[in-house]
Regions:
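Conserved Rossmann-fold NAD(P)-dependent oxidoreductase catalytic core, especially the SDR/UDP-sugar
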Residues: 73, 98-125
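Short loop/helix-cap segments at secondary-structure boundaries that form the rim of catalytic
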Residues: 37-44
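Structural motif
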Residues: 3, 69-70, 111
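NAD(P)H-binding glycine-rich loop region in Rossmannoid oxidoreductase-like domains
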Residues: 53-92, 103, 123
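Rossmann-fold cofactor-recognition segment
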Residues: 44-55
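Short beta-strand/turn micro-motifs composed of small residues
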Residues: 8, 32, 116
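Conserved glycine-rich Rossmann-like NAD(P)H-binding loop of the short-chain dehydrogenase/reductase
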Residues: 26-36
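N-terminal Rossmann NAD(P)H-binding glycine-rich loop of SDR-like oxidoreductase domains
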Residues: 4-24
Length: 125
């Protein structure tokens, strides 16, 4: 793997994955919400792209290059507070994950890794 895309890159898991990838010589495109980048390092091999989950279908057109190997999807809206109980939002997250998968395919990624959480269980319970 030489190039990776990470959504939710400024979050707890995403930022740790970005740092690990960079430390291992992988060029990373960090996809963030509203240009949030507080948890991301300054690094020559890091490109930061702002793209909302609701606009994930537009991600391929926002990238500087197209030779990405893997797509890590960690972005999720409403993972804290009252939004956790918003069934419509949690189901929308599932659709946005499908949109991310389609974007990864369009970009040419060979692998798509999506991490879940208890949110899927709580929404369905």
């Amino acid at each position: 793997m030489t190039h990776a895309i990470v959504t939710g890159a400024n979050g707890f898991v995403g930022s740790a994955v970005v740092k690990e990838l960079l430390n291992n010589g992988v060029s990373v495109c960090a996809v963030v919400h509203n240009d949030h980048r507080d948890n991301l390092p300054d690094h020559a091999n890091l490109q930061i792209v702002s793209c909302e989950l609701s606009n994930m279908k537009t991600l391929p057109g926002l990238l500087d290059e197209s030779d990405y190997d893997v797509f890590y999807h960690f972005a999720w809206a409403g993972s804290a507070g009252p939004a956790r109980a918003d069934t419509a939002l949690q189901l929308q997250n599932a659709q946005w994950t499908v949109d991310a998968l389609h974007a990864a395919k369009e970009i040419g990624c060979q692998r798509f890794l999506c991490a879940g959480s208890i949110m899927e269980h709580e929404t369905m319970a």
